[in-house]
């Protein structure tokens, strides 16, 4: 079971056993759950999914991309916020949604977003590895691992794997996040708009 804090065990029938005293509410288990049944108060697959669906998607005739950013609320989202406060500009075609931890990102959100006409999805989270900065220890690492396998799903949908990107961001990277976004938007423009536009 994917929990960086060991809050989920299995019984003899391999059903999950939750130890709420160890749970830090990072949502990493929610991101790993294929049937989207794990949720927390004020944070669930449905609440984030609703935010993703609420974004206006330009139609195929407008020739404007729409890019979703799922940003860790601990480092990446504050860096985006600080970029705005410092008037550092980046593409107007992105829409950022904060997530509790990058580890909480469920691949269903990615495929739902791309199926509904988003041209790309960028995930921004804390640094992983030996000198990790993830507030939930392995959340970012687990998200990177999960996203490394999404290419096959995208190919089945007839989409390029480059439409999904994961970036490590520090809370002080306010100028860098703007640059990463603009580079990604340029990459999406080069690939072309999503063939899913108009079908969502």
Model-identified regions with their sequence ranges:
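Short helix-loop-beta junction
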Residues: 84-96
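Short Fe-S-cluster ligation motifs
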Residues: 27-40, 56-62, 66, 155-159
């Amino acid at each position: 079971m994917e929990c960086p804090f060991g809050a989920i065990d299995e019984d003899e029938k391999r059903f999950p056993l939750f130890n709420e005293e160890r749970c830090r509410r990072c949502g990493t288990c929610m991101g790993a759950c294929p049937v989207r049944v794990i949720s927390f108060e004020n944070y669930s697959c449905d609440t984030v999914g609703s935010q993703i669906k609420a974004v206006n998607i330009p139609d195929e005739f407008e020739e404007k991309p729409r890019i979703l950013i799922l940003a860790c609320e601990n480092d990446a989202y504050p860096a985006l916020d600080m970029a705005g406060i410092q008037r550092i500009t980046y593409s107007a075609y992105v829409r950022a949604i904060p997530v509790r931890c990058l580890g909480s990102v469920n691949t269903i959100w990615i495929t739902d977003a791309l199926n509904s006409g988003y041209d790309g999805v960028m995930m921004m989270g804390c640094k992983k590895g030996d000198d990790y900065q993830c507030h939930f220890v392995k959340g970012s690492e687990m998200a990177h691992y999960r996203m490394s396998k999404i290419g096959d799903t995208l190919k089945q949908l007839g989409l390029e794997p480059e439409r999904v990107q994961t970036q490590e961001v520090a809370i002080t990277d306010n100028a860098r996040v703007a640059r990463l976004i603009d580079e990604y938007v340029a990459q999406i423009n080069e690939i072309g708009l999503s063939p899913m536009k108009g079908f969502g």
